[in-house]
Amino acid sequence: MRNLKMILEYDGTRYKGWQKQKKDVLTIQDKIETVLSKMTGEDIQVIGCGRTDAGVHAENYVANFHTNCDFTVDYMLDYLYEFLPEDIVVKTMKDTSERFHARYNVKSKTYVYRINNNKFRSVFNKKYAYHDNEKLNISAMKDAAEFLIGTHDFKSFTRLKSNSKSTIRAIKYINITENQGIISIEVNGNGFLLNMVRIVAGALLEVGKENIKPIDIEKMLNEKKRADASLILPAKGLCLKDIQY
């Protein structure tokens, strides 16, 4: 049996996230499994590198699946390109080790949250960036981000309904950059809690607006109180950028 590794990108706007759910719920996984099953005549189960929430996008999402088919990789890529909707594209595919598992072999993930800080929202990036035109103190945001680097209990940076067994996570780096008014908050870590990156971005945005101070981020960490909904930025600004194995 073959084990095939795929790298894909998708616009998550109209989907209820990656993971397949009950019937008639639109998800990325369900779309891909449906097309692969039709192509191979098998009941294909796709293993994803992790869950992305409703409305979240991905630039380099990694998945794998097992099949007995003997189609070439080029044939399968062309088939997927033809039959998947325009907002999902499988960019690469290759035969890989039987032991490869897209989820369990992940060492770290990189997400980016984008904020359009220009005066007016953009017609062309409105689905991929959160618009906030209040003047931001980028230097203060960078100072605040330093408190989040390392291994911490991120209980204050997840939703009340999160049922994760452990809220300990390790963030390797947070890079904050600005290009033509688009603020990108890039976060790399060994794993993330429910809505964690969106809450981190929301907290850093509050620092940028000078509603709170950089040191308040450290206080939030130490308080270990689950975040209130006001800190959670909209899903559309979040994108899974890369996966490290």
From Swiss-Prot:
It catalyses: uridine(38/39/40) in tRNA = pseudouridine(38/39/40) in tRNA. GO terms for molecular function: RNA binding; tRNA pseudouridine(38-40) synthase activity. NCBIfam families: hisT_truA. Homodimer. Substrate binds at Y111. Its EC number is 5.4.99.12. Formation of pseudouridine at positions 38, 39 and 40 in the anticodon stem and loop of transfer RNAs. GO terms for biological process: tRNA pseudouridine synthesis. This is tRNA pseudouridine synthase A 1. InterPro entries: PsdUridine_synth_cat_dom_sf, PsdUridine_synth_TruA, PsdUridine_synth_TruA_a/b_dom, PsdUridine_synth_TruA_C, TruA/RsuA/RluB/E/F_N. The keyword Isomerase applies. Belongs to the tRNA pseudouridine synthase TruA family. Gene3D superfamilies: Pseudouridine synthase I, catalytic domain, C-terminal subdomain (3.30.70.660), Pseudouridine synthase I, catalytic domain, N-terminal subdomain (3.30.70.580). It comes from the Bacteria. It comes from Clostridium tetani (strain Massachusetts / E88). The gene is truA1. It is an enzyme of class 5 (isomerase).
